[in-house]
Amino acid sequence: MGIKFLEVIKPFCVILPEIQKPERKIQFKEKVLWTAITLFIFLVCCQIPLFGIMSSDSADPFYWMRVILASNRGTLMELGISPIVTSGLIMQLLAGAKIIEVGDTPKDRALFNGAQKLFGMTITIGQSIVYVMTGMYGDPSEMGAGVCLLITIQLFVAGLIVLLLDELLQKGYGLGSGISLFIATNICETIVWKAFSPTTVNTGRGMEFEGAIIALFHLLATRTDKVRALREAFYRQNLPNLMNLIATIFVFAVVIYFQGFRVDLPIKSARYRGQYNTYPIKLFYTSNIPIILQSALVSNLYVISQMLSARFSGNLLVSLLGTWSDTSSGGPARAYPVGGLCYYLSPPESFGSVLEDPVHAVVYIVFMLGSCAFFSKTWIEVSGSSAKDVAKQLKEQQMVMRGHRETSMVHELNRYIPTAAAFGGLCIGALSVLADFLGAIGSGTGILLAVTIIYQYFEIFVKEQSEVGSMGALLF
């Protein structure tokens, strides 16, 4: 059934635009250039407003997810990476459940990637239509069919651009992946803005600066009671404060510390006697994949819930899924869940909120830990990083584990890899919950993604530089 499905979608994959693999080795400086160009295009798209929208001043229903999904309201990057991640989530789960069987051959892998891309474009069209028809940019009946179609086309083309930019980096022209690059950029931009924003906000206490650090100096300069000003800078409500900033730095440090946790399995060459090495199995074996997939799941649940709430607000089943309220305190107007399943799957706003509603906190913790562990365990089976796949890679490199025969390598790797995947996913979820409870800027999920992605890029740079260095040693 699985192979038949991949064969059925094969003709459709041919019509999709594709980035060809490089025919030569791309040099490090060239990779940096292509990565910078990709990031520049993404940032430009984040600033270009959608043509034809009547208004985007209403409460933002996806405010909480925008940082993680690298989206920017009212611009070409309205959808961000949501369609790509959602298609990846669904296709990987289908493959993991063996509903779609993907073989080890390059042909099957290519067909699977093509199916994922096709599904991603289908989701882009679907989300574009939902955004327009639910009135995010104004009443569709007032805008007219032509304008609605124009906005949908703009969102579709922007989605295609994101997909191709990601593929450009994935094919080896740049460093890392487009998805990771866009997420990290968006989160870091948010953290810097919340710390140094010069924007003023009219609160009940008077005009205040949004940026936590700028607010500190402003409060100390304008208030006569310096102790009270200092306390306000650290603990003010509805705007970024210094405790949020300290929590963010603390979580950054903790995640970087855990990145170093790993088990080194001793391996040796089957061909050359005396050639020894180690195969590292990290605590975060699947890196940030669990948190990305979990974010995609929650964001799509939010989309469905708010779409149904807008149409059938009094329905009991719709209310059980989620009820929503609008707020504009301390920033732009945004919608947030106040009841139903969506409320319990959303993070508490602060540690005080945890004490006010402990049931909400417990459900959220269980959901985060369980979903991250599940996605991490599932991911290794469909991404070519399971014990069986690793044993196959070592065999192809003519490496064996010391003290074990080739036939027993899979059994030995199975002792470590599934455990590292599940426990690593659990730790990722726990750190995300901790960051949320401490009130870290950019949400716990966002901080986790930013740190793991930046660390990945650090490792890529070190690897690329070592290769350049070894080549230089050979040449000179």
From Swiss-Prot:
**A Gene Ontology biological process annotation?**
post-translational protein targeting to membrane, translocation
Q: Does the keyword Transport apply?
A: yes
InterPro entries listed in its UniProt record = SecY/SEC61-alpha (IPR002208), SecY_CS (IPR030659), SecY_dom_sf (IPR023201), Translocon_Sec61/SecY_plug_dom (IPR019561)
An example Gene Ontology molecular-function term: signal sequence binding
The residues the entry assigns to the signal sequence are none
Recorded topology in the membrane: Multi-pass membrane protein
Q: What is its main location?
A: endoplasmic reticulum
Q: Which residues lie on this side of the membrane: Lumenal?
A: 54-76, 139-144, 194-240, 310-354, 442-445
Q: Where are the transmembrane segments?
A: 34-53, 77-96, 118-138, 145-165, 173-193, 241-261, 289-309, 355-375, 421-441, 446-462
- Provide a GO CC annotation, any one: Sec61 translocon complex
**Compartment list:** Endoplasmic reticulum membrane
* Family that this chain belongs to: Belongs to the SecY/SEC61-alpha family.
NCBIfam families named among the record's database cross-references: 3a0501s007, PRK08568.1-5
Q: How does it assemble?
A: The SEC61 channel-forming translocon complex consists of channel-forming core components SEC61A1, SEC61B and SEC61G and different auxiliary components such as SEC62 and SEC63. The SEC61 channel associates with the multi-pass translocon (MPT) complex.
Its name, as the record gives it, is Protein transport protein Sec61 subunit alpha isoform 1
Q: Which organism is it from?
A: Bos taurus (Bovine)
Organism placement in taxonomy: Eukaryota, Metazoa, Chordata, Craniata, Vertebrata
Name the gene that codes for it: SEC61A1
